[in-house]
Regions:
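Short, conserved turn/kink motifs that form compact alpha/beta structural patches or helix kinks used as
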Residues: 1-6, 16-117
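N-terminal low-complexity, intrinsically disordered "leader/linker" segments enriched in small/polar
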Residues: 11-14
């Protein structure tokens, strides 16, 4: 077993130990013909199994549109998790917005999410 295979297996174990199924929604932006962008209709990406991890403290992030938000949750997924900044998902009665995605190291995907107002 290679080191990469070992780490991928460990990521799978962490997720399977405390799985959460979330349904991400994504709004694609397109050229509006006037030099700007227009939001399309939300696309449901379907259920995806991840591990949700609470955040200690109140880390803050700036969103691409300039908002400062407090990160409430981390989302741990497999390397092929279909998740992007701006995606939203409901969890335990709250709506969350993905504000950061990292695919490094290559054996996992980690995202940060903020409660969406």
């Amino acid at each position: 077993m290679t080191e990469l295979e070992f780490h991928i297996r460990q990521t799978r174990h962490l997720i399977d130990n405390q799985p959460e199924v979330i349904s991400l929604s994504r709004i694609e932006l397109s050229d509006d013909g006037a030099g700007g962008q227009a939001a399309g209709e939300p696309t449901d990406l379907g259920p995806q199994t991840v591990r949700i991890i609470g955040i200690l403290g109140t880390p803050r992030r700036m969103t691409p549109d300039g908002r400062e938000v407090i990160v409430n949750k981390s989302v741990l997924g497999m390397p092929d998790l279909d998740i992007a900044v701006g995606d939203t998902f409901p969890l335990a009665g709250y709506d969350y917005e993905v504000v950061m995605v990292s695919r490094e190291p290559t054996w996992r995907t980690i995202a940060e999410a903020a409660e969406h107002a």
